[in-house]
A protein has these predicted regions:
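The feature marks the mature, well-folded catalytic cores of soluble enzymes
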Residues: 1-115
Length: 115
């Protein structure tokens, strides 16, 4: 009801059919505008119809958990194909060391305080 009163909508995405995703941000990030970065697990989901979905390259799923802030895209280092793809799309890609956080399934969105 609150969402509707403030002219927002919501969509349920059932992650039980996607066992490799710990939570939605594990496989999906907003890149600004109507563009999303997604893993193959979720890239074709019907809830994403109407969005431009950029799929992370094979074997680089962890890179899908990124943060777009102040015209820079913070990404985990060590995923060169994803970084190159995002750079080609015009993003200022800033790779960050995440290897220790990754050991405990932590990602960039886990470390951020969002507004």
């Amino acid at each position: 009801d609150w969402l509707r009163r403030h002219r927002f909508t919501s969509t349920v995405i059932d992650l039980r059919a996607m066992p490799r995703l710990l939570h939605l941000k594990t496989g999906l990030s907003w890149l600004g505008g109507r563009r999303l970065l997604a893993t193959g697990d979720i890239a074709g989901h019907e809830a994403l119809n109407g969005w431009e979905v950029v799929q992370v390259p094979e074997g680089e799923d962890y890179a899908a958990n990124c943060i777009w802030v102040n015209d820079a895209l913070l990404v985990a280092e060590g995923f060169p194909a994803t970084s190159a793809l995002l750079g080609e799309l015009g993003y200022d890609v800033v790779p960050l060391a995440m290897s220790e956080f990754r050991k405990m399934d932590g990602g960039l969105s886990c470390l951020s305080v969002r507004w």
